[in-house]
């Protein structure tokens, strides 16, 4: 359980490691630590650690990239936080099922990547269309992830798989 707390803290720290990108917002390292939580702690403990991080943010501890509090559930980006929990689980589960190798760690990370974006994009669609009354199609939301988010997170998958391989 100590490791769960440590990874919850690492995900929180990752939210504040913000890399500015010209003409865009910023890029954080949260996803990197979410992947490592699943790869190193396994499915259950990885999901618990990321779930603790999300729970702390929802009760008001300002550990999300843009603060904290229960109102965060109405932000279009909250779906990615939900996706992080499932991603840590899926990444850990795939890692547990496959033989230890960089290729398999990368496969586990990519499974987490797909889960994070699937949940995040659908949640953003629901919040924008039904809560914020800002019409947006799933396609437009998906395409809005390409300039920075998806390529950057793909690189984080490569790095996390390499880091996990070096821990073995």
Residues covered by each model-derived region:
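Hydrophobic transmembrane alpha-helices
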Residues: 1-49, 59
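Short helix-perturbing small/polar motifs within transmembrane alpha-helices
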Residues: 2-6, 13, 71-118
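Alpha-helical transmembrane segments of multipass membrane proteins
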Residues: 11, 15, 49, 57, ...
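Interfacial aromatic-anchored transmembrane helix boundaries in multi-pass membrane proteins
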Residues: 15-26, 54-87
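Alpha-helical transmembrane segments and their helix-entry boundary regions
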Residues: 46-50, 105, 141
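Interfacial helix-loop-helix junctions of multi-pass membrane proteins
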Residues: 61-66, 124-143
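Individual transmembrane alpha-helices with interfacial aromatic-anchor signatures
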Residues: 78, 138-159
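Conserved small/polar residues in nucleotide/adenosyl-binding loops
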Residues: 167-168
């Amino acid at each position: 359980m100590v490791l769960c707390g440590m990874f919850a803290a690492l995900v929180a720290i990752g939210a504040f490691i913000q890399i500015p990108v010209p003409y865009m917002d910023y890029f954080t390292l949260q996803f990197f630590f979410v992947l490592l939580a699943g790869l190193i702690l396994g499915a259950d403990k990885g999901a618990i650690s990321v779930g603790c991080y999300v729970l702390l943010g929802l009760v008001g501890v300002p550990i999300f990239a843009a603060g904290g509090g229960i109102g965060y559930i109405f932000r279009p980006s909250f779906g990615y936080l939900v996706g992080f929990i499932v991603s840590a689980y899926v990444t850990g589960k795939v890692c547990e099922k496959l033989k230890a190798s960089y290729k398999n760690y990368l496969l586990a990370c990519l499974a987490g990547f797909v889960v994070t974006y699937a949940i995040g994009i659908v949640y953003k669609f629901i919040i924008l269309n039904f809560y914020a009354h800002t019409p947006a199609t799933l396609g437009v939301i998906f395409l809005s992830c390409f300039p920075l988010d998806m390529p950057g997170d793909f690189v984080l998958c490569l790095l996390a798989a390499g880091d996990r391989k070096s821990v073995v």
